[in-house]
């Protein structure tokens, strides 16, 4: 049996632009894609911290070092410039693979520059962010 497991995320990224009249997708700085092990064209879930919207789309590689997080097409009705978002990927794994897998977590600053890489999906490093109550860290599992 395969399980759908958390694979990677880019945490608390800032939307740099939202363009309604563009072919749908999300444009992401190639440095961020590589750090999170996300390929161009890969399915991502995007959660908007600012307004609670959620959607799925695919990635387009953006200029390396640009910090771009561009919401394209119809998704621009839901997510806007300067919104904080989380881009999340999932993968199908066997139970054995899932138990051994270490996800990629990319924390970014307000300019979408990488400030920390990790593998604990519950770790909060941004000011004011705390670990969810009762959440174990990966080392405790």
UniProtKB/Swiss-Prot annotation:
Substrate binds at residues 57, 73-75. Its cofactor is pyruvate. The active site is at residues 25, 58. It is found in: Cytoplasm. The modification Pyruvic acid (Ser) is found at residue 25. GO terms for molecular function: aspartate 1-decarboxylase activity. It is an enzyme of class 4 (lyase). Keywords: Autocatalytic cleavage, Cytoplasm, Decarboxylase, Lyase, Pantothenate biosynthesis, Pyruvate, Schiff base, Zymogen. It holds the Pfam family Asp_decarbox. GO terms for biological process: alanine biosynthetic process; pantothenate biosynthetic process. Belongs to the PanD family. HAMAP family: PanD (MF_00446). Catalyzes the pyruvoyl-dependent decarboxylation of aspartate to produce beta-alanine. Heterooctamer of four alpha and four beta subunits. This is Aspartate 1-decarboxylase. It comes from Pseudarthrobacter chlorophenolicus (strain ATCC 700700 / DSM 12829 / CIP 107037 / JCM 12360 / KCTC 9906 / NCIMB 13794 / A6). The gene is panD.
